[in-house]
From Swiss-Prot:
Xenopus and other lower vertebrates contain duplicated wnt11 genes resulting from an ancient gene duplication event, but the second copy has since been lost in mammals. This gene was originally called wnt11r. but was renamed to wnt11 to reflect its orthology. GO terms for molecular function: cytokine activity; frizzled binding. Disulfide bonds join 78-89, 128-136, 138-155, 207-221, 209-216, 281-312, 297-307, 311-351, 327-342, 329-339, 334-335. This is Protein Wnt-11. GO terms for cellular component: extracellular region; extracellular space. Glycosylation is required for protein secretion.
């Protein structure tokens, strides 16, 4: 009986830690530029797609270059956003196979799913405005007036189309019948929606001035999205305050509820995760930790990049680094600036 109990416990653990295939499509970032994407059979050569995404590729071939670009943006933006953290998103480069930091329902996995969902919709919305996607153009002009001295013009980012097509592609793996545990599906669908909510909230009015001698008597305005790096920073804030959840029966169905705060439901605006993460101090590829040995740290910082936090109390080593920068700049009439290149030595620090 004890053996059966342990086996059941182990299988339950696997069901709740194995991820569905939600972010394997990030492997598209490795697609060679030489690969043509002008015929449906080319979809078979794309890495990381599940069958439903493959079908979307065949029926929406014109979107695939944009989606490939989105995968590259996710990787670049994630690494940039976490450059000051112990977990620095470097394992995202392993797509379509990952270590446990992204293979399990972790806080890190929550962030990457949210960013991926936001990025694909963001990239498609922007591609519509630049004319890169046939059959999709600028967003419609809003019905309400922008206000006195303002007028609608320019080319607004087509957010509605971006979310429509982006969610079809990025959510497709989680909606497959055989794609991991129900708990993981619910978690990743929730976090993907949080990413899209942050994207929607980033839509803002942007304007250009018109008038005699730059008087700006009239402003032409449109609605545009913030840069993906700004959206990533908003999601990073949510990552830091993410809520741990459990898959628990409520009524006739199971739902994700906060593990420690059973009196309230999961908030639609917060990232959620099922499995706690390690501290990422020491290298352990089995759990997806690259460690912080030889990571650069900031001796004077009080943040996550400080040498105390980044190095996990192991201490740090100084080294001297040469920096070349512009200096002795002069303005010449009219109208250009010339500078010289100066070299200086700065002290930097890496973790022991």
């Amino acid at each position: 009986m004890k053996i059966y109990f342990l086996l059941g416990t182990f299988l339950t653990f696997l069901l709740h830690t194995r991820i569905c295939q939600g972010i394997k499509w990030l492997a598209l970032s490795k697609t060679p530029l030489s690969l043509p994407l002008n015929q449906t059979q080319h979809c078979k050569q794309l890495e990381g797609l599940v069958s439903s995404q493959m079908q979307l590729c065949r029926s929406n071939l014109e979107l695939m270059q944009t989606i490939i670009h989105a995968a590259k943006e996710v990787k670049k933006t994630c690494v940039k956003a976490f450059t000051d953290m112990r977990w620095n998103c470097s394992s995202i480069e392993l797509a379509p196979t990952f270590h446990q930091d992204l293979e399990r329902g972790t806080r890190e996995s929550a962030f990457v799913h949210a960013l991926s969902a936001a990025a694909i919709s963001h990239t498609i919305a922007r591609a519509c405005t630049t004319g890169d996607i046939p059959g999709c153009s600028c967003a419609p002009i809003p019905g309400e007036s922008p206000g006195p001295g303002y007028r609608w013009g320019g080319c607004a980012d087509n957010l509605n189309y971006g979310i429509l097509m982006g969610s079809k592609f990025s959510d497709a793996p989680m909606k497959m019948k055989k794609s991991g545990s129900q708990a993981n599906k619910l978690m990743h669908l929730h976090n993907s929606e949080v990413g899209r909510q942050v994207l929607k909230a980033s839509l803002e009015m942007k304007c250009k001035c018109h008038g005699v001698s730059g008087s700006c008597s009239i402003k032409t305005c449109w609605r545009g999205l913030q840069e993906l790096r700004e959206i990533a920073l908003d999601l990073k804030t949510k990552y830091l305050s993410a809520t741990k959840v459990v898959h628990r029966p409520m009524g006739t169905r199971k739902h994700l509820v906060p593990k420690d705060i059973d009196i309230r439901p999961v908030q639609e605006t917060e990232l959620i995760y099922l499995q706690s993460s390690p501290d990422y101090c020491l290298k352990n590829e089995k759990i997806g930790s690259h460690g912080t040995h030889e990571r650069q740290c900031n001796k004077t910082s009080n943040g996550s990049d400080s040498c105390d936090l980044m190095c996990c109390g192991r201490g740090y080593n100084p080294y001297m680094d040469k920096v070349v920068e512009r200096c002795l700049c002069k303005y010449h009439w009219c109208c250009y600036v010339t500078c010289k290149k100066c070299e200086r030595t700065v002290e930097r620090y890496v973790c022991k």
